[in-house]
Amino acid sequence: MISQQTIDIVKATAPVVAETGPKLTAHFYERMFNHNPELKDIFNMSNQRNGDQREALFNAICAYANNIDNLAALLPAVEKIAHKHTSFMITAEQYQIVGGHLLATIDELLSPGQEVLDAWGEAYGVLANVFITREEAIYQENEEKTGGWRGTREFTLIEKTQESDVITSFTFKPADGGTVSNFKPGQYLGIYLTPDAFEFQEIRQYSLSSAPRTDNYRISVKREEGGKVSNYLHNELTVGDTVQLAAPAGDFFLDVPATTPVTLISAGVGLTPTLSMLDALTEHQASVHWLHATENGSHHAFKDYVNTLADKYDHISATTWYREPLATDRPAEDFDYQGMIDLKAVASQLIDPAMHYYFCGPVGFMQHVAKQLIELDVQEDNIHYECFGPHKVL
């Protein structure tokens, strides 16, 4: 338990910390990487350069300080972050390193005095223990599953399939010939890469793009312009190569009774977690609607597969939007609507108040979808979404 004195001090000084803004997290990361450069093998340095990770940390610090007397309000965020941490193999010792640099940053930028530093130190220790406990439980759960493991495990690339001009699928099988653990549709894998051309080890999370299988995992990756890892996977990784994988994780997953209707909404490579869900919903007892937006036919991954499912199963329907169709793209055959996703076009399919919505894509797209769902009076508990990269509140 956190002492009342600590709660009072943290809440009183939280506005001062908040006013420091991005300067605080920039100083923190610079300090930490200077003193502990080995952590560059864990943190996504691309997210450091674009500021996403700094923003995420700053938001987390402010949220914790503002809710220090109501930790239950933080549990959803704790669950999301804890799953991500397990895919990075974060350890209790690393929490000590981070805490030390966070307190030193507050001291160096604000000079608040020892009493304030002690209060923030106590508060950080309590939160760190919450994460350490939850993450250890996830590690144990992953290890105890049939086909499960702790840490990383060597896998061999057995199939590489181009799904569109920008998306390629990679299927991995355990190098030891064993089985793989089950996962929940919507979850992701952590992949660890250390090519000679990389300055640091690179760790990325990619959504699993099929329903669970017993002997392999499939991810589908978009080639990002300037993306170090995605371009390496597309250009360099070949069948027979090996990689290290962390066990599946993630708090965004299909979790509804078989009688609950579901709508899956995606844009671009955001279809990967929802495709895993669709793959698992072929025997669902309620309606399933697949709504997907992409640039045009050359970017449209898994078109034939999704259409085959929609033709085969009466409870599955599929609707597609192309933002800028090519001259060769045929309306009503290759796509249904032009432009951005407009849920009014399929409003008759979305009238059941029990329906759950799962969506993923670029942040702007998800904000667009969330706004429309709210306008349709969809209950917040029925809305689920995933951000690729640091989480953002829509």
UniProtKB/Swiss-Prot annotation:
Which residue numbers delimit the FAD-binding FR-type domain? 150-255
Q: What catalytic reaction does the record list?
A: 2 nitric oxide + NADPH + 2 O2 = 2 nitrate + NADP(+) + H(+); 2 nitric oxide + NADH + 2 O2 = 2 nitrate + NAD(+) + H(+)
A Pfam family cross-referenced in the UniProt record is Globin
For this UniProt record, the keywords arranged alphabetically read as follows: Detoxification, FAD, Flavoprotein, Heme, Iron, Metal-binding, NAD, NADP, Oxidoreductase, Oxygen transport, Transport
Indicate which residues the UniProt annotation says bind FAD: Y188, R204, Q205, Y206, S207, C387, F388, G389, P390
Q: Where is this region: Reductase?
A: 147-394
Q: Which residues bind NADP(+)?
A: G268, V269, G270, L271, T272, P273
Please list the residue ranges annotated as the Globin domain.
1-136
- InterPro entries associated with the record: Cbr1-like_FAD-bd_dom, FAD-bd_FR_type, Flavoprot_Pyr_Nucl_cyt_Rdtase, FNR_nucleotide-bd, Globin, Globin-like_sf, Globin/Proto, Hmp
Binding locations of heme b:
H85
Per the Swiss-Prot or TrEMBL record, the active site comprises Y95, E135
Output the PANTHER family linked to this UniProt entry: FLAVOHEMOPROTEIN
Described function: Is involved in NO detoxification in an aerobic process, termed nitric oxide dioxygenase (NOD) reaction that utilizes O(2) and NAD(P)H to convert NO to nitrate, which protects the bacterium from various noxious nitrogen compounds. Therefore, plays a central role in the inducible response to nitrosative stress.
Family statement: Belongs to the globin family. Two-domain flavohemoproteins subfamily. In the C-terminal section; belongs to the flavoprotein pyridine nucleotide cytochrome reductase family.
Under what name is this protein listed? Flavohemoprotein
Source organism (scientific name): Photobacterium profundum (strain SS9)
Q: What is the lineage of its organism?
A: Bacteria, Pseudomonadati, Pseudomonadota, Gammaproteobacteria, Vibrionales
- Name of the gene: hmp
